[in-house]
Amino acid sequence: MYSTQEKASRLMADISRGRHFVMEGSMSSFHAPFDPLFDLAVYLLADTQIRMVRIQQRAKARFGDRVLPGGDLYEGHQKFLDAAARYDTDGSPNQRAHQMWAESLPCPVLQLRGEDSPAENLKQVLHAYEKVVREPRCGDHMEGPRWS
């Protein structure tokens, strides 16, 4: 396990090697140095039931029987599922914290619905990204609401 500072340092070293990067997942504990670097943020919000099914499918595909009863990852996976099920209410990190972070970003934030197909969401991301690359640096031109 890496400390918060180690995570940020290692990640910054990796992304500084290229001109562009894609960041995926929650960065709740170490986002600050990266926030000014984002040109576009994508916030995917899925209904609890849909999210839980997808998490279980992804874990099974990635880790196989290791996440099933008797597997070496079973206990940890169950703890993760418990936290994920509480995301909309009192889980940590929770939906409210992520929304507050997204609202504080100096770039456009595209909100996607988990109920939409991956193909539809990809289409929206590509459209938003094309718009961003044609405009000045995101932090220099944003005004008004950023949730779309």
Feature annotation, model-predicted:
Residues 45-94:
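A glycine- and Lys/Arg-enriched "phosphate-lid" helix/loop adjacent to the NTP-binding pocket
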Residues 38-41, 58-61, 128-129:
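Glycine-rich, phosphate-binding/catalytic loops in enzymes
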